[in-house]
Amino acid sequence: MKYSDLRDFIAQLESRELLKRIDYPVSPHLEMTVVSDKVLRSGGPALLFTNTPNYNMPVLTNLFGTVERVALGMGEESIVALREIGKLLAALKEPDPPKGFKDAFSKLPLLKQALNMAPKYVSGAECQTHVWEKDEVDLTLLPIQTCWPGDVAPLITWGLVTTRGPHQSRENMGIYRQQLLSKNKLIMRWLSHRGGALDYQAWQQEYPQERFPVAVTLGADPATILAAVTPVPDTLSEYAFAGLLRGQRTRLTRCIGNDLHVPASAEIVLEGYLEPGNEAPEGPYGDHTGYYNEVQSFPVFTVERITHRDKPIYHSTYTGRPPDEPAILGVALNEVFIPLLQKQFPEIVDFYLPPEGCSYRLAVVTIKKQYPGHAKRIMMAVWSFLRQFMYTKFVIVCDDDVDARNWQDVIWAMTTRMDPSRDTVMVENTPIDYLDFASPVSGLGSKMGMDATSKWPGETQREWGKPITMDEDVLNRVNGYWSLLGLK
């Protein structure tokens, strides 16, 4: 599905009955979470709340509440096609050297397509139709959700944050939640390894007393949002990748008050800065783990300016115990990850991040095992290959006769092919999600790899068990007269 901006995407979803307008008054304080959660768990449509009490702005939730809608946002019609996007990223990330002139010529369209999707810079953008400055700036006029009863304050959840480090031409995009502090202040919660935090750290080293420019987009088009959460190669900007997904170049415009660029079709843009040394305690908030996170200090984002379109739409979500919207995104992006992994490790048959594992904390990998110790190599590969797997605590490796997406298969393999001492790998003092309160130190913890593959000579001194299977001829004969037995 091709679309020009968020509003076009909404219109097309509505025409397919994949989006529902809610005209009944629903409050962004807790009530929208209840409605959105019930609809998401039933596989229902995206929701546009048009009657938000005390606010003059509609709220969009559950935009990516099904895998189908994630695929549509990536310009595809089904989750199966997301593997092709993964293959595209794999080709751009690790291009194979051409085998000859004909092969080199065949690769040109892909490279040319990527190069031709560089952003298009425009002026007079629709996202700057209205401008609030100085005393006009009032974040409390936005229908920012309070998602859970124990949340300390309203929370921006779909803020697309643009930053740029010193001496860098490329801008970084990331999605970081932001706690409302006052009419013009938010808390920018980003983890230390994320692009925005790294840009800010580099800025403070270069300009220790100067303000760090930041722009936050609320209501970007789906391709731009999804590009920000996809493992785009460093050689390709997120905006260029968004253009590839959308089938047309991303239109960007320069912020009014700094040199950063934002999507021209964005619904709302917040312009401002971080002041070195200015931090505030953030949280607690209900999170994608299903728990409230602990309170930690993060930089304060001072908003100098708010720009927006005519009749802007506020894009929001909630996070909680899976399934939630991030979990659905994780299931879809799982299909993108597989070709990236297989490009480097072709012995991988399947890779699965179960949503109940908080989308990234546990991975199941099936392989065509080729030598003793092979499973341990794959564990290390998962932990080190993509930044997205830095916080994966558990990796279970199985043979290719196991369905990675079937817990009955996986548990059978673990309980019959594993010796806890021999087949468990523990790695200590590794990076761990700050939200993982189970780790002994904030941001630092251990990882466990489990080898649930059949063991080869050299890995065991015992004769290995042979799986029980029925004779094919007997199966076919019984299936032939099954209908005559009076059984279902």
Swiss-Prot record:
GO biological process: ubiquinone biosynthetic process
GO-annotated molecular function: 3-octaprenyl-4-hydroxybenzoate carboxy-lyase activity; metal ion binding
Pathway: Cofactor biosynthesis; ubiquinone biosynthesis
Keywords recorded for this protein, A-Z: Cell membrane, Decarboxylase, Flavoprotein, FMN, Lyase, Manganese, Membrane, Metal-binding, Ubiquinone biosynthesis
Binding-site residues, Mn(2+): N172, E238
Main location: membrane
Active site: D287
CC cofactor note: Binds 1 prenylated FMN per subunit.
EC number from the UniProt entry: 4.1.1.98
HAMAP family: UbiD (MF_01636)
Family: Belongs to the UbiD family.
Subunit details: Homohexamer.
Protein name as annotated: 3-octaprenyl-4-hydroxybenzoate carboxy-lyase
Source organism of the structure: Legionella pneumophila (strain Corby)
